[in-house]
Design a protein with these regions (language model features):
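N-terminal Rossmann-like NAD(P)+-binding domain of SDR-like oxidoreductases, especially those catalyzing
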Residues: 1-63, 146
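Active-site proximal helix/loop that lines the substrate pocket
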Residues: 9-15, 62-68, 98, 118, ...
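Short, glycine/charged-enriched secondary-structure capping and boundary segments
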Residues: 18-22, 71-75, 106-108, 142-144
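Short-chain dehydrogenase/reductase
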Residues: 25, 30-41, 72-79, 102-103, ...
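Solvent-exposed, non-membrane alpha-helical residues enriched in polar/charged side chains
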Residues: 45, 79-83, 114
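C-terminal substrate-binding subdomain of Rossmann-fold SDR/epimerase-dehydratase oxidoreductases
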Residues: 86-164
Length: 164
């Protein structure tokens, strides 16, 4: 095996007040999931430094697209919102809806993985895979309402612990 490409997560950044994230930014995971993803990045670096195994950690940002589990409460906000809107059911927004997301289409994730597998100079690196710009959940909901020709308002619930 020449190189391992690891599926890391933007959740490693935690809840930063700025939307653009850079690989050199401070890390502050807020959930066990985020901490586990970051710990795995450290394992990748350790294997690279200790054994020379080439590793590349790709930090994915809110992946969406075909074959996504529409029932996942954390990673499927787009299909979940669409299903609710088409059914006339108010989608739940945790918190005030001002939390922002950089939604990245699955084809871009696949392309990033293929590039990381062969790119010279990528070994030992952490690379963000995102599209930019970020959208708040309320902006996403408004855009989906517009595209679908619906006008369903969200139901707000308390913010989830560890949600960024």
């Amino acid at each position: 095996m020449r190189r391992v490409v690891y599926a890391a997560s933007s959740s490693a950044y935690g809840d930063r007040p700025y939307s653009a994230k850079r690989e050199c930014d401070p890390l502050a995971p807020l959930s066990p999931y985020a901490a586990a993803k970051l710990a795995s990045e450290h394992y990748c670096h350790a294997f690279y430094r200790t054994y020379g195994l080439e590793t590349v950690c790709l930090r994915y940002f809110n992946v969406f697209g075909p074959r996504q589990d529409p029932n996942s409460p954390y990673s499927a906000v787009i299909p979940l919102f669409i299903t609710k809107l088409l059914s006339g059911v108010r989608p739940t927004v945790f918190g005030d809806g001002g939390q922002s997301r950089d939604f990245t289409y699955i084809d871009n994730i696949v392309h990033g993985n293929l590039l990381a597998a062969d790119a010279s100079g990528a070994a030992g690196q952490v690379i963000n895979v995102a599209m930019g710009p970020s959208y708040t959940l309320l902006e996403l909901l408004a855009a989906l309402n517009s595209l679908l020709g619906t006008n369903v308002q969200p139901l707000h619930a308390p913010a989830r612990v560890g949600d960024v």
